Swiss-Prot record:
This is Conotoxin Cl6.9. The presence of a 'disulfide through disulfide knot' structurally defines this protein as a knottin. The cysteine framework is VI/VII (C-C-CC-C-C). The keyword Nucleotidyltransferase does not apply. The keyword Signal applies. Residues 1-24 form the signal peptide. It is found in: Secreted. Residues 25-37 form a propeptide. Its main location: secreted. InterPro entries: Conotoxin.
Amino acid sequence: MKLTCVLIAAVLPLAVCQFDSTDASAYMRKNPSLRSPKRTRDCKTKGSVCFASSECCIQDCWFVCLY
């Protein structure tokens, strides 16, 4: 009985993660502009202030776009 509970507890988070990634994949298919990690539309260039690397055209960010 304990083994069954342990297995269920171990598999449940994996199943939840799988559902989340499936939803994300479907969302990416619906919106093709999100597929490419190097989107050039609305991206910031070198020296621009950034909070995440995805904001920069080349995706390197350390408070400012590095490339």
